[in-house]
């Protein structure tokens, strides 16, 4: 079974990093509650510290299942609305990376 690292990075408006961290860590908790899987939240050290990255491991054959669960959740939807004014529009970058050394 193929494993992917799914990563989403977004830029944060000046003076909004604390709010961005609050929103994304709440979303990570909801993701864990609904899927039983971890989502890691980080920000960059050095370079541009005003970016937030959410990262999770997913099985390729179940790629859309987790997203369907969380996107239907009312708490998740409310947090998505809070992105406006916190995250910079048009800066979202999604990346999927195939894991080549997944432990068995």
Regions found by a protein language model. Give the residues of each.
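Non-catalytic surface loops within mature trypsin-like serine protease
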Residues: 12-14, 58-62, 100-102
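Short hydrophobic/aromatic segments of transmembrane alpha-helices and their interfaces
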Residues: 1-2, 46, 59
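Active-site-flanking beta-strand signature of metal-NTP-handling nucleotidyl enzymes
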Residues: 3-11, 53
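An amphipathic, aromatic/His-enriched active-site/gating alpha helix that lines ligand/cofactor pockets
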Residues: 25-41, 57-94
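Short, low-order "capping/linker" segments at domain edges
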Residues: 92-104
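N-terminal secretory/targeting leader peptides
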Residues: 41-42, 52
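Short acidic/glycine-enriched loop/turn segments that link adjacent beta-strands
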Residues: 47-51
